[in-house]
Amino acid sequence: MSLKATVTASDEGTVIHLAGELDMSTVEALRQAVVAELHDAPARVIVDLGELTFCDSLGLGTLLVLTRTARSQRTLLVLRRPSPFFLRMVEVAGVGAALTISF
């Protein structure tokens, strides 16, 4: 299983494009990518989930922790283009209010 995290800059803020699977073997790559971007204290970091093919509960938990970490640094972490599966997982877990999701 693999995850590719590509960072680009846009008018909206820093965008981290994820492609592949987010699970216990790849969450560290996501964590490192987001923490590296938070170092510069941007107003917003967007995590683009449009090419994410799988996410398990550890992946969702990592996104929740990273959202809290970003908020503590006054950065908004936005999850963009989630799949229906990801949205269902968020709903079942009851964590939608803790995440900022953009379509």
Where are these regions (language model features)?
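STAS-like cytosolic regulatory interaction modules
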Residues: 1-54, 65-103
